[in-house]
Amino acid sequence: EALGAKADQMIVATASYEVTDPTVDSQIVTLQASGADTFFNFATPKFAAQAIRKVYDIGWKPMQFVPFSASSVGAVLVPAGLEKSIGIITGGFVKDPADPRWKNDAAFQEWLAWMKKYYPEGDVTDQLNVWGYLTAQVMAHLLTQCRDDLTRENLMRQAANVKNLQFPLYLPGLKLNTSETDLRLIKQMQLMRF
């Protein structure tokens, strides 16, 4: 949709997989054979790691994009191989716990303390844990906005009326906004390259 009328000229191949497939190796080989120079690796974490590894192993060097859900250093890039993940691009919206620049950040330190207390077995390099924490903060905010009217209707009304909400574990400058016609909270991302 985003490519409009040029989509047929720009998309040279697509490949899908089933979650019951043992690997996505054959799909990657097929995509490489198409001559594609860009690879949108929109897979779940397990299969994204397999795809990253296979792309590297067969010597294919496309510009590679992965979705936020498959960009976790701990859950995807380490299993794929860090050296095999160099150059991967994603859209980010949370402070990545594997990024050393946030090591002394107050919000990051608060999250680490929370992880140690409530989820000590959790992977502190997995940004999906940060996302879960932030999702809980958003929910707490919405419930607070409901005050004493804790009905589904009021919760949905509050969810449709978020204006410039910020939490310190989102990337600086990211603001959450919703409306009655668009309940998606995340509308801003920053491109990041590993």
Question: At which residue positions do the language-model features occur?
Answer:
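Extracellular/periplasmic periplasmic-binding protein-like sensory domains
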Residues: 55-132
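Segments of small-molecule ligand-sensing domains
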Residues: 117, 122-130, 136, 140-194
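Extracytoplasmic/periplasmic, Sec-exported soluble proteins
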Residues: 16-23, 40-47, 99-103, 124-135, ...
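Stable alpha-helical elements in mature extracytoplasmic
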Residues: 1, 20, 24-27, 47-51, ...
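Active-site lining segments that contact anionic ligands and/or coordinate catalytic metals
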Residues: 37, 61, 85, 186-189
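Extracellular/periplasmic Venus flytrap/periplasmic-binding protein
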Residues: 1-58
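Sec-exported extracytoplasmic/periplasmic mature domains
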Residues: 4-5, 29-36, 53-61, 78, ...
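Intrinsically disordered, low-complexity boundary segments flanking structured domains
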Residues: 2, 73-81, 161-162, 177-181
